[in-house]
Swiss-Prot record:
PANTHER family from the UniProt entry: SUCCINATE--HYDROXYMETHYLGLUTARATE COA-TRANSFERASE
Disordered: annotated span: 221-245
Protein's UniProt name: Formyl-CoA:oxalate CoA-transferase
Membrane-spanning residues: none
Gene: frc
Active site positions, chain numbering: 167
Enzymatic class: transferase
Enzyme Commission (EC) number: 2.8.3.16
This protein's record includes keyword Transferase: yes
Subunit structure: Homodimer.
Species of origin: Streptomyces avermitilis (strain ATCC 31267 / DSM 46492 / JCM 5070 / NBRC 14893 / NCIMB 12804 / NRRL 8165 / MA-4680)
Function: Involved in the catabolism of oxalate and in the adapatation to low pH via the induction of the oxalate-dependent acid tolerance response (ATR). Catalyzes the transfer of the CoA moiety from formyl-CoA to oxalate.
GO terms classed as biological process: oxalate catabolic process
Keyword Manganese attributed: no
Length: 409
C-alpha cells in the first residue's frame, strides 16, 4: 500500500524538538525524510540520557522513520553536497537561529535558484520585529504567546503547561504549512517559503483567551470562578472558561492523580444531583438552572467533590458516563503508558532499536485509512551516509572515505 506522501523527499536540517516533531510527522505520512546532522550529531542524541553511550529517548522519540546523514556544511565540499541535496528535495526544513542558513550561503533566493520547486520551511521563535533575534525555548514561547499568563490559580504565579505547545505545537503548524505549499505547487509548479514562529503557534492555541480579553470590556467573566477581575484575563485554575463549566474533583484514595475532570452541562445537572445524593438541588431555584449555578461554581464543585472523594476515579468515571456526563480521569504518565486502549490504537508503541533494544514512544495521532503508519526506529548517526551519498548522489566509495577522513561527513 502506498503512503500519503510517498515520493516526497524531505531534507531535514532540524534539531531538538520543534523541527524534528514536524519532520517526524511528515515521515509518518510516508515522506522520505533525510535528517542532515553535523558530524557530531543532533545535540539531543546525548541529552537527558537514561542509558550510557546510546541515543537518548529525547532523540529517539522525535526522529522515528527517518534516515540520517552527516555533513559539515561549513566546508566547501560540504556546501557543494548540500547544494545537490537541495536540488533533489521537495521540502527543506530548518529551525536554526535567525539568519544561520543565510550565513551558510543559502539564502532563500539562492535555494529557489537551485530548486524552484522546493518548499522551504523555517521554524523560529518569533516573527519579524523587536523579538526576532531572541532565543526561544518551549516555555519562552508559552510565556510570550499567552499561555503562562492564563495558566495557574488566581492567587499563584504563572505556570507552564506540561504539553509541549511551543515546540511540538509549532511543529504541527509547520506541517500544515508544508502540506499546503506542496498542494499549491501542484497548480503553480513552484515551491515557496513557509515561516512559522513558536510565539505565533502558541498564540493560535490560546485564541479563546483573546476572546475573553475582549469580553472583559463588557464586565466580569461569569464563567470564571474568580472573585476579582481587572483588565487582563486572569488565571482560573482548572476552570474551562467556556460555556460548560468544568473542574477537577478529588477521588479516593487521594493520590496526586486521583482526580476526575467533570463538566456540568444543563442536561446533566439532574442525574448529577442524584448521583451526589442531593436530588433536591435539581428543582431548587438556587441550583436548577445554569444561570443560578454560575455565580456559585466553586460551591457546586465542592458538592460534587464531597461525593467523588469517597470513590476511586475509575468508579466515578463509570457512574458519570452511565448518565452521559462528560468527564475524564486524570491519567498519570505511568497510566498512559500502560493504557490498553492507547496501545490497541497504536498511540503508545514499542519500537525496536539497534542499541537500546527497544523503547516506548508515541504513535501517530493521524489515522489515514489508505496510509497506515508503522513506527520504525530512529536512525543511528550517519547510518545512511553510504546509501545516500553513494547510492543516490553517485559518489564513489573512495570519495566517501576521503570525505570522512577530511571531516566533511
Amino acid at each position: 500500500m502506498t503512503k500519503a506522501l510517498e515520493g516526497i523527499r524531505v531534507l531535514d536540517m532540524t534539531h531538538v524538538q520543534s523541527g524534528p516533531s514536524a519532520t517526524q510527522l511528515l515521515a509518518w505520512l510516508g515522506a522520505d525524510v533525510v535528517k542532515l546532522e553535523a558530524p557530531t550529531g543532533d545535540i539531543t542524541r546525548g541529552q537527558l540520557r537514561d542509558l550510557p553511550d546510546v541515543d537518548s529517548l529525547y532523540f529517539t522519540m522525535l526522529n522515528c522513520n527517518k534516515r540520517s546523514i552527516t555533513l559539515n556544511t561549513k566546508t566547501e565540499r560540504g556546501k557543494e553536497i548540500l547544494t545537490e541535496l537541495i536540488r533533489r528535495s521537495d521540502v527543506m526544513v530548518e529551525n536554526f537561529g535567525p539568519g544561520a542558513v543565510d550565513r551558510m550561503g543559502f539564502t532563500w533566493d539562492r535555494i529557489r535558484d537551485i530548486n524552484p520547486r522546493i518548499v522551504y520551511a523555517s521554524i523560529k521563535g518569533f516573527g519579524d520585529g523587536p523579538y526576532t533575534d531572541f532565543k526561544a525555548y518551549e516555555v519562552v514561547a508559552q510565556a510570550m504567546g499567552g499561555s503562562m499568563s492564563t495558566t495557574g490559580f488566581e492567587d499563584g504565579p504563572p505556570l507552564a503547561t506540561g504539553a509541549q505547545i511551543g515546540d511540538s505545537g509549532t511543529g504541527i503548524h509547520a506541517v500544515a504549512g508544508i502540506l499546503a505549499a506542496l498542494y499549491q505547487r501542484e497548480n503553480t509548479g513552484r515551491g515557496q517559503r513557509v515561516n512559522v514562529a513558536m510565539q505565533h503557534a502558541v498564540l493560535n492555541l490560546c485564541r479563546v483567551k483573546l476572546r475573553d480579553q475582549q469580553r472583559l470590556a463588557h464586565g466580569p467573566l461569569a464563567e470564571y470562578p474568580n472573585d476579582d477581575f481587572g483588565d487582563e484575563v486572569p488565571r482560573s485554575g482548572n476552570a474551562s472558561g467556556g460555556g460548560q463549566p468544568g473542574w477537577a474533583v478529588k477521588c479516593a484514595p487521594g493520590g496526586p492523580n486521583d482526580y476526575v475532570y467533570v463538566i456540568v452541562q444543563p442536561v446533566g445537572w439532574k442525574p448529577l444531583s442524584e448521583l451526589i445524593g442531593r436530588p433536591e438541588l435539581a428543582d431548587d431555584p438556587e441550583w436548577a438552572t445554569p444561570e443560578a449555578r454560575l455565580p456559585q461554581l466553586t460551591k457546586m464543585f465542592q458538592l460534587i467533590e464531597e461525593w467523588s472523594a469517597t470513590l476511586p476515579k475509575w468508579e466515578v468515571l463509570e457512574k458519570l458516563n452511565a448518565h452521559n456526563i462528560p468527564c475524564g480521569p486524570i491519567l498519570s504518565t505511568k497510566e498512559i503508558v500502560e493504557d490498553a486502549s492507547l496501545v490497541a490504537n497504536e498511540m503508545v508503541v514499542t519500537v525496536p532499536h539497534p542499541e537500546r533494544g527497544e523503547f516506548v514512544t508515541v504513535g501517530s495521532p493521524l489515522k489515514l485509512s489508505d496510509s497506515p503508519v508503522d513506527v520504525t526506529s530512529s536512525p543511528l548517526l550517519g547510518e545512511h551516509n553510504a546509501e545516500v551519498y553513494v547510492g543516490e548522489l553517485g559518489l564513489g566509495d573512495e570519495e566517501l572515505r576521503l570525505l570522512k577522513s577530511n571531516g566533511v561527513i
